[in-house]
Amino acid sequence: MRNICVIGSCSMDLVVTSDKRPKAGETVLGTSFQTVPGGKGANQAVAAARLGAQVFMVGKVGDDHYGTAILNNLKANGVRTDYMEPVTHTESGTAHIVLAEGDNSIVVVKGANDDITPAYALNALEQIEKVDMVLIQQEIPEETVDEVCKYCHSHDIPIILNPAPARPLKQETIDHATYLTPNEHEASILFPELTISEALALYPAKLFITEGKQGVRYSAGSKEVLIPSFPVEPVDTTGAGDTFNAAFAVALAEGKDIEAALRFANRAASLSVCSFGAQGGMPTRNEVEELLS
């Protein structure tokens, strides 16, 4: 069993389902409303745990009922919460999600996630006895992402930086990350002067650009490779990217080569969109391996 440390956001998702996505100034009727645990960090932690890794979640929640529910959900999914801390007088992070026409739109309120400082994250990393892979995203302070990538680089700990939500990154942070996994929109923010192919060629076997139902694209050095996704009828795409990143982390930590790891991650992500909720459809190890066989 590999040890994976996820440093990132934990939130409660407030999910509205509608037949139509509202335009600016428009009011539409929804068909359902649910609250489900989410946050990119928590989603990736749960997905990695279901795929068989021992997962340590490093993050913060508010001192509210959402925070309690988030912690209970992590524990119920086998995620270690030794390095999770409630923040007094602060609300838990929330994500406000509209599901319509098989896709989603999301507004994130950081809440306690904004209190994850570099010192807090690095202290947790130093205490975990052995880390095979670190996963980090951008729903936490920018300086924390920068310092964690720098620490991992200097200590030879592989780290996947999932640069979502999109924002520009310092060049040294890009250099310090072992792997970068933006989607097409995020890649355009990271590399505004480059085409997709130019960016991939600049970072072979480091930059992996996810393209939704098309799959994931990367440079193998001498050629550009597209690993196709597995075709499914999506119910809820909210957790697909998080499942992809978690599965990619697990596969790499287990020693799979890049192409095999990407195929594993694509299959896991495809399965994840077949049920409601960011975490609801996240598959087990057996489910992914059955699809691969």
UniProtKB/Swiss-Prot annotation:
Report any Pfam family annotated for this entry.
PfkB
CDD domains recorded = ribokinase
Query: Which positions in this protein are listed as binding ATP?
Result: N183, T210, E211, G212, K213, Q214, G215, G241, D242, N266
Q: Which reaction does this enzyme catalyse, per its entry?
A: D-ribose + ATP = D-ribose 5-phosphate + ADP + H(+)
Q: Which GO terms describe its molecular function?
A: ATP binding; metal ion binding; ribokinase activity
The entry's substrate-binding residues are S11, M12, D13, G39, K40, G41, A42, N43, E139, D242
InterPro entries the UniProt entry points to = Carboh/pur_kinase_PfkB_CS, PfkB_dom, Ribo/fructo_kinase, Ribokinase, Ribokinase-like
Protein location:
Cytoplasm
EC number(s) per UniProt? 2.7.1.15
Catalytic residues, chain numbering: D242
Chief location category:
cytoplasm
Question: According to the record, how does the cofactor bind?
Answer: Requires a divalent cation, most likely magnesium in vivo, as an electrophilic catalyst to aid phosphoryl group transfer. It is the chelate of the metal and the nucleotide that is the actual substrate.
Subunit: Homodimer.
**Protein's job:** Catalyzes the phosphorylation of ribose at O-5 in a reaction requiring ATP and magnesium. The resulting D-ribose-5-phosphate can then be used either for sythesis of nucleotides, histidine, and tryptophan, or as a component of the pentose phosphate pathway.
What is this protein identified as? Ribokinase
What is the native source organism of this protein? Bacillus subtilis (strain 168)
Q: Which gene specifies this protein's sequence?
A: rbsK
